[in-house]
């Protein structure tokens, strides 16, 4: 395994570990999800460039578009929750609290 792949896998693992550990605030969860998506984008782009697989050149761009949509939906959810409850705690998102 080359150093680039190992660094990208390490970035993904650290982001996932951050997502599992820092679940109290919605903003930290969104940042960890964004780090995971960016490491997947980097891994996909490097893999496609090293294998010269020209048919899949659009795949990292599609993944980046999905990451941007995820970030937009997450930030709108963050604004809605902070306006409604006054804080961005994830425990406020429980649907059973009516």
From Swiss-Prot:
GO biological process, alphabetically ordered: ATP synthesis coupled electron transport
The keyword Transcription regulation appears for this protein: no
Main location: mitochondrion
Membrane topology designation: Multi-pass membrane protein
InterPro entries for the chain: NADH_UbQ_OxRdtase_chain4L/K (IPR001133), NUOK/Mnh_C1-like (IPR039428)
Record keywords, A-Z: Electron transport, Membrane, Mitochondrion, Mitochondrion inner membrane, NAD, Respiratory chain, Translocase, Transmembrane, Transmembrane helix, Transport, Ubiquinone
Catalytic activity, as annotated: a ubiquinone + NADH + 5 H(+)(in) = a ubiquinol + NAD(+) + 4 H(+)(out)
Keyword Acetylation (UniProt): no
Transmembrane segment boundaries: 1-21, 30-50, 61-81
The enzyme's E.C. designation: 7.1.1.2
Alphabetical list of Pfam families matching this protein: Oxidored_q2
Subcellular location(s) of the protein: Mitochondrion inner membrane
Molecular function terms from GO: NADH dehydrogenase (ubiquinone) activity
Biological role stated in the UniProt entry: Core subunit of the mitochondrial membrane respiratory chain NADH dehydrogenase (Complex I) which catalyzes electron transfer from NADH through the respiratory chain, using ubiquinone as an electron acceptor. Part of the enzyme membrane arm which is embedded in the lipid bilayer and involved in proton translocation.
Subunit field text: Core subunit of respiratory chain NADH dehydrogenase (Complex I) which is composed of 45 different subunits.
Family as reported in the entry's similarity comment: Belongs to the complex I subunit 4L family.
Protein name (database record): NADH-ubiquinone oxidoreductase chain 4L
Lineage, broadest ranks: Eukaryota, Metazoa, Chordata, Craniata, Vertebrata
